[in-house]
Amino acid sequence: MTRIAITGGRVLTMDPERRVLEPGTVVVEDQFIAQVGSPTTSTSAAPKSSTPPGWQCSPASSTPTPTSHKSSSGVVHPMTATSSNGCTTCSIPASLPTQTTTSESEHCCTAPKPFVLASPLSSTTRTSDPTTSPAPGPPGSPFTDAGIRAIYARMYFDAPRAELEELVATIHAKAPGAVRMDESASTDHVLADLDQLITRHDRTADGRIRVWPAPAIPFMVSEKGMKAAQEIAASRTDGWTMHVSEDPIEARVHSMNAPEYLHHLGCLDDRLLAAHCVHIDSRDIRLFRQHDVKISTQPVSNSYLAAGIAPVPEMLAHGVTVGIGTDDANCNDSVNLISDMKVLALIHRAAHRDASIITPEKIIEMATIDGARCIGMADQIGSLEAGKRADIITLDLRHAQTTPAHDLAATIVFQAYGNEVNDVLVNGSVVMRDRVLSFLPTPQEEKALYDDASERSAAMLARAGLTGTRTWQTLGS
């Protein structure tokens, strides 16, 4: 049996009582949390002889915390970061096929690696990754190597819309030398591929890797495609995800809002994780609550693409479970959940002119226990409680930006940068110790990864006719 005792710091438990133990101790035995409590009551479960050296934290300097769960993100397009600057929501799906068709298999293998590297460095240990096509080899293999959790959400379009052809043609004209790739596929083809992915890869790597169906957008997926995803979630995968109401065009296509359309089809349920949900009204929110649909809000992505601001305070007021996602690098340029937590808090304060509209405590809940609820794992992760999986981060608050740290929740949300994350455990295994990742133990290996990703990105964008550069664009005279 492997035992680890993390002692000496404040423990943010996120348990039902939201206890903050100061000082506190978390005892880990193999994959599970054995005890959470004061040093005197907990350390007896882990004798010093079994405790790895160095896990004694300086008083008030390190905060053991449940790991963050990014409820929706994307990993295929870190290779295209900043290339979408100035694009709107609708132009992103139209332009990405041009980029993706230039991706060699090696690029698809390299692209997730910077994402995987950045995730634990800024607190994230579980992510949902919607992607339109299977990566070469085992989906999630970079996640397997890194030791973090991942949901490989197989995104698909099986009902392309003629209404978008003019828009796609206009955008494609900007890169006439690029070969356009049609990402749509027949429903039967998609479902056969999804069946194969689930059979081969779901619940692999000690259960850390999951495969979900992910019909892309209601107005570009057939009724058959959506109902099949719902049935697969109920019988095999426990969850499914979809982009919902990110852009107002979804309402125009169906002459009703997307949530109402999904309700009409019987496709709202408690296994659905709906991403974005920007252009929705009070009826839509009531439907989400009625069916216990989970929401992944993407504040930075929605701001980056000028999509709008999701009515998160209204969702919370109605009792809807909301988690936080970063979205992809092509519409965020970062995968730093801690910095996105601050953006989420500030945009709603500004939009409502109400400094108490979302509290830092609620933001922390959305990033931890509510994020776990979004992916159906609140009984296993999301809080530091005996019997749960040992998914834990420690934050070193001895930095200029986090000094002083009077209020723990406010410090994490409003002061932290993300580089305060010092240690990461997933399933009881050490993924990062003193900011050294277990899968990249030397600076040379880390630098080689950055160099490889940069070179492949430049080559990919060049073949797509997207140089990644543009003239300096100022405003005014």
Swiss-Prot record:
Q: So what family is this one in?
A: Belongs to the metallo-dependent hydrolases superfamily. ATZ/TRZ family.
Q: Name one Pfam family in it.
A: Amidohydro_1
For this chain, the annotated S-S bridges are: none
Starting at the broadest rank, the lineage of the source organism is:
Bacteria, Bacillati, Actinomycetota, Actinomycetes, Mycobacteriales
Source domain of life = Bacteria
Q: In which pathway does it act?
A: Xenobiotic degradation; melamine degradation
Bias kind Low complexity: ranges: 38-73, 120-132
Q: Name one GO molecular function term.
A: hydrolase activity, acting on carbon-nitrogen (but not peptide) bonds
Q: EC number(s)?
A: 3.8.1.-
Q: What protein does this entry describe?
A: S-triazine hydrolase
What does the protein in this record do? Hydrolytic deamination of the S-triazine substrate melamine.
- Region Disordered, residue ranges: 38-77, 120-143
What is the native source organism of this protein? Gordonia rubripertincta
Which keywords annotate this record? Hydrolase
PANTHER family, per the entry: AMIDOHYDROLASE-RELATED DOMAIN-CONTAINING PROTEIN, AMINOHYDROLASE SSNA-RELATED
